[in-house]
Amino acid sequence: MGCFCAVPEEFYCEVLLLDESKLTLTTQQQGIKKSTKGSVVLDHVFHHVNLVEIDYFGLRYCDRSHQTYWLDPAKTLAEHKELINTGPPYTLYFGIKFYAEDPCKLKEEITRYQFFLQVKQDVLQGRLPCPVNTAAQLGAYAIQSELGDYDPYKHTAGYVSEYRFVPDQKEELEEAIERIHKTLMGQIPSEAELNYLRTAKSLEMYGVDLHPVYGENKSEYFLGLTPVGVVVYKNKKQVGKYFWPRITKVHFKETQFELRVLGKDCNETSFFFEARSKTACKHLWKCSVEHHTFFRMPENESNSLSRKLSKFGSIRYKHRYSGRTALQMSRDLSIQLPRPDQNVTRSRSKTYPKRIAQTQPAESNSISRITANMENGENEGTIKIIAPSPVKSFKKAKNENSPDTQRSKSHAPWEENGPQSGLYNSPSDRTKSPKFPYTRRRNPSCGSDNDSVQPVRRRKAHNSGEDSDLKQRRRSRSRCNTSSGSESENSNREYRKKRNRIRQENDMVDSAPQWEAVLRRQKEKNQADPNNRRSRHRSRSRSPDIQAKEELWKHIQKELVDPSGLSEEQLKEIPYTKIETQGDPIRIRHSHSPRSYRQYRRSQCSDGERSVLSEVNSKTDLVPPLPVTRSSDAQGSGDATVHQRRNGSKDSLMEEKPQTSTNNLAGKHTAKTIKTIQASRLKTET
C-alpha cells in the first residue's frame, strides 16, 4: 500500500549546452531527485563544462506557454512548478545569465570560449543585430577559430557557405568573410575568439536581456536589462536609458511593473509598464533585482545586502540573489586564475551543404542540394538544438492539448533557424507562426490564391471500413509530431511524399482531347459571332463617297467657248462663279490613340461634299478644299476681275479671265473656258 502515498522522486533531465551537445542527469547516475536543490544541478553542469567563473552562467527552462525562467539555486526542483509540469523528461538550457561588461577581461580561456559560443548564437538567432561589415568581421574570426589559417588547397571556393553566422545569410557576406579570413594568418583559436568578443562588445545590443511590455495606449515597448542599467526601446529605437545608481525602486503588482528613477533634480519619477501576464511581470521583476544586485552591490556583508534588496521587494514577494557580485568575483583571491595547464576542448560547429554556383542549371542545383542534405543527415549523429531566447512575443498561450504542443521534449520549443520574436521583428512577424506563415494552402495547379480552392487530390472510395479507419489513424499520427528535425517527422515527410507520388500516378488523366475540344468550341464561337472580330483600325465603307462623287460630277459642266468672232464686250459677258470662303483653317491632329483617330476621321467625313472634293482634287490637282460657308454667283466686268487679282485677298477666290493662246500654225486665237455651276472650286484651262 506504500505505492499510493509515496511521492515519485525519479528525475530525468537533459541539459543542452552551448556547443550543441547534451548532458543527461538522472537519479540512477547522479542521484538527482525532485527534492534536490537547484544548486546541485548547477554544480554538475559546471563540473562537466570545467568552469570556475560560474556566477555568469545559469540554467533556463520554459513552461507550456513558452515563458522562460531561470533555475533558482536556493529552491528544490519540486518547487519549480513550471518545470515539473513540463515533464518528464525535463529540459534545461545552459547559457549566460549575466553578460560581462568587458568579456575580454575574463580570466580563463574556457570562460571566454563559453561567452564566444553564446554571443555567436545571439548573432545567428538575431538577438544581437549588427551591420554587414561587422558581421563579416565576426564571421571571419569565427572561421579562423574553426578552421585555422586559410589553405587554398583545403578551402575551396564556397567553403564559408558551409557555416551559418547571421540570419538570412547572403552570398555577398560569405565572399566578404572569405576575403577577411585570408588576412588573419597566424591567429590561434583563443586569439580569434578574443578578437570576436572585442568586436561584439561594442555593439549596441550586446548583453541586453529584452522583455516585451506595453506602454500607454497599448503601444509595444521592450525593457532591456544591461550591465549598466535599464534601456527602453520602441520601434527599434532607444527612447530611454536609466543607470542602476539612479534606480531607487523596482516594484510589480499583478501585471503592472513600476520603475522608479531619481532625476538630476533629486526628484523621483515612476515609470509604469504592463506585462502580458502575471508570470511574465514577476519574471521581469526577478531579473531586474538580480541584475541590480550583480552589477551594483559590492558589499560582502549579508545584512547590508539584505537591506539593499528589501528596497526592491514587492508586497508578499521577497527575492534575494545568493551568488557573488561582479566586483566580488574580480577581487576573489581564493582561487588562482587562470589555472595552469588548462586544456580547452572545442567542438565543431554544425555544417550545411555548400552553396552551389548560380551558373548551373536549376534542376542540377535542386538534385545536388537534396543529395547533400541526405548525406549530411546520414553523417551527423547529433541534432542541432538552440537554447531559447529570453524575448517572447505577445502571442497567447497555445492549448496544451493542441498538436503543436505535443512535441518531443528533447527539442527546444521553437523552430530552428525560424524568425525570432524580439525587438527587430515587425508586429506582423511576431504574431505569425514561423512554421505555417500562410493561413491558406495554395492550389498547385492554379496561378493565384484567388483561383479555385478545391482540393486537387482525388481520394478513392474504400470498400472496407477498416481500411478507412487505418488511413485516418495514419494521418492522425503524422500530424501529431511537429518537432523540428525529429526522425519521426522526417519519416512522416518521406511517407507523405511517397503517398503523394503514388496518388498522383494513379490519378493522371490525358487532358489533350478535352483541351482540343475547348479550343475548337471557342474557335467556332468566334467565327459565328461577328462582334468578336477585333481590328486595330476600323474599316469604313467607301460607297457613300463614290455615290456623292458621281452625283457631283453631273453638275460640273465643261464647255469650250470659242472666243473668235466675239467682241470685247461679249468677252466681258462670259459668265463665271464667284466663291467666297470664311472660317478657321482645318486643324490636323497627330494622335496615336485609335479612339481619337476614329473621332477625327468621323469629323472629317461627316460632310459628304467635303470628303468628295478632297478625293476629286487629289486626282485633278485642284487646290485643297476649304470649308464653304457662303456661295454667290455674280457676273462682273473684267475690271472687277482685275481688281480682285490686284487685291490678292486670301479669303476670296475668283476665276481668271479667259486667256487666249496663239496658234502659230493656224494663226488663230482660241480660248477654252471651263464653266462650273454649284462647285466649290474653279479652274481655267487655256
From Swiss-Prot:
Expressed in many tissues. High levels of expression in brain, liver, thymus and peripheral blood leukocytes and low levels of expression in heart, kidney, testis and colon. Residues 357-376, 418-428, 673-686 have a biased composition (Polar residues). This is Band 4.1-like protein 4A. Gene3D superfamilies: 1.20.80.10, Phosphatidylinositol 3-kinase Catalytic Subunit, Chain A, domain 1 (3.10.20.90), Pleckstrin-homology domain (PH domain)/Phosphotyrosine-binding domain (PTB) (2.30.29.30). It comes from Homo sapiens. Residues 11-299 form the FERM domain. One of its GO terms (biological process) is actomyosin structure organization. Disulfide bonds: none annotated. Residues 331-686 are annotated as: Disordered. Residues 479-489 have a biased composition (Low complexity). It holds the Pfam family FERM_C. The modification Phosphoserine is found at S304, S389, S393, S402. Residues 518-527, 547-561, 648-658 have a biased composition (Basic and acidic residues). InterPro entries: Band4.1-like4A_FERM_F1, Band_41_domain, Ez/rad/moesin-like, FA, FERM/acyl-CoA-bd_prot_sf, FERM_2, FERM_central, FERM_CS. It is found in: Cytoplasm, Cytoskeleton. Residues 588-601 have a biased composition (Basic residues). PROSITE patterns: FERM_1 (PS00660), FERM_2 (PS00661), FERM_3 (PS50057). Keywords: Cytoplasm, Cytoskeleton, Phosphoprotein. Its main location: cytoplasm. One of its GO terms (molecular function) is cytoskeletal protein binding. GO terms for cellular component: cytoplasm; cytoskeleton.
